[in-house]
A protein has these predicted regions:
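Conserved small/polar residues in nucleotide/adenosyl-binding loops
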Residues: 158-161
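Beta-loop-alpha module in the N-terminal Rossmann-like domain of NAD(P)-dependent dehydrogenases
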Residues: 86-144
């Protein structure tokens, strides 16, 4: 019988794993021999980048922003211009189909009622997820995302400004 993990334990272990990945020195993985450590830069996909997502992406500029998705291209145009190398989409499912395999993590800042499904799709693909609040609308959805993150061994982080 598997031991249940408390929310506190999950958050501690997830934070420790994220910090551990962020601080692995390049020399451990052989950068001087031409190999770039995975911790040097992450490939990030952004979903919902026109509003709050724009501010979140600003904090991720040191990473590789490889794909951007927003349903309102007029509203998100300034973000598309800020990251000209990123591929643009208006449907996160199309972006996931095309780019999720090459991504390390996904940033979700869409309308509140869409967070859970967009995050779940990324988690089941084995990608780490940063999500704006609220993470979900129900306790059931929250528990489901927590179980998925545990099953797929990824970090699921949500914050509020």
């Amino acid at each position: 019988m598997a031991k249940e993990m408390s929310r506190r334990t999950f958050l501690k272990q997830g934070a420790a794993a994220a910090i551990g990945l962020a601080v692995v020195p390049s020399t451990v993985l052989g950068k001087k021999f031409g190999y770039t450590a995975p911790s040097d830069k992450l490939n990030i996909l952004g979903v919902g980048v026109g509003g709050r997502g724009a501010s979140v992406l600003k904090g991720l500029e040191s990473q590789n922003i490889i794909g951007l998705c927003d349903v309102d291209w007029k509203y998100a145009d300034h973000i598309f211009k800020r990251y000209p190398a990123a591929k643009k989409f208006n449907d996160y499912r199309k972006m996931y189909d095309e780019m999720l395999k090459s991504a390390d993590a996904v940033m979700v800042a869409t309308a509140d009622h869409t967070h859970a499904i967009i995050a779940a799709d990324a988690i089941t693909a084995g990608k780490h997820v940063y999500c704006e609040k609220p993470l979900t609308h129900t306790v059931y959805e929250s528990r489901l995302l927590t179980k998925l993150a545990d099953k797929y061994k990824v970090c699921l982080l949500y914050t509020s400004p």
